Amino acid sequence: MPGAIITGTAYGCLEDTVTFITRIIEQNEEMLPPTSFIQSTHNTVAAQIALTLKCHQYNNTFVHKGISFESALLDAAMLLNEGETDNILVGGLDEMTDTSFTILTRLGLYKRWPVSNLELYSTKSKGTIGGEGAAFFLLTDKASENNLAGLTALRTFYKPAGQNDIEKKITGFLAENSLTVNDIDLIITGRSGDVRHDDVYDALSTILFKNNALANYKHLCGDYPTSSAFALWLASNSIKNKSVPAVILERGKVATAPKKILVYNHYQKIYHSLMLLSAI
């Protein structure tokens, strides 16, 4: 039984939201069944898990747009450090519906024509591919052979001043953990295939990360605000399994057993996050 349940989501349960709003229009705001409204709230998933497990402990949901999952992860780390519990279920999730896909495509977030996910990064154009997903982790402050990896450090930052500011924050983050970029076996970035946003990663790959093995992940899950949860799952399993899937590698060779992996992602160039994982 987890000692706490914490989730992060930017959109919440969109399918039920669309259903409820549609009924408001169709029924002229009269005689509306409340079920869809109740299930459309952002904390529905965390609440349903708690009800299923009969877990009456700390339960929280973070709705912080592009750093919703990281906020949940940070809250969990703080609870563990405070000794409130010794294991916490943490998850990041967002779903995509026909309605949300149509709206976000009109807003220019997604490409307006079909593109193979394996050709996402070679298709130089505006927009990315839509995605959705859910990834959950059981965090504990006790090391064991069952652990996938150790979450060494986490950092988020908002609207950096420019490329130099981003590089300073990354090097400062590593320095706080007594590391340099040369100590990192693999860097997983949130490259999305959108030329308006990938220039950040392009600049890093030729300057700060020029000697590092690089990997991408959004061609596997698509782009959505909490996709970093998928990246964390990918990184932790790469450390546990002592190998990196060839399908994610962009450049370089990785040690047979990567011991340190850095995950760097930004959403819309506004919300940035760094996650450092280490072998146990």
Model-predicted segments: where are they?
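Conserved active-site "lid/cap" helical segment
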Residues: M1-I6, A10-D16, A72-D75, D165-D185, ...
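Residues that mark the start of a beta-strand
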Residues: P2-A4, N87, P258-K260
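Short beta-strand segments
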Residues: I6-T9, V63, I88-D94, V263-H266, ...
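Short acidic, glycine/serine/threonine-rich loops at helix termini
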Residues: D16-T19, T99-L104, D199-V200, S273-L276
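Active-site-proximal alpha-helical scaffold in enzymes
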Residues: H42, A50-T52, T61-G92, E132-E145, ...
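Acyl-CoA/ACP chain-elongation machinery
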Residues: D86-I88, G92-R106, S125, T152-Q163, ...
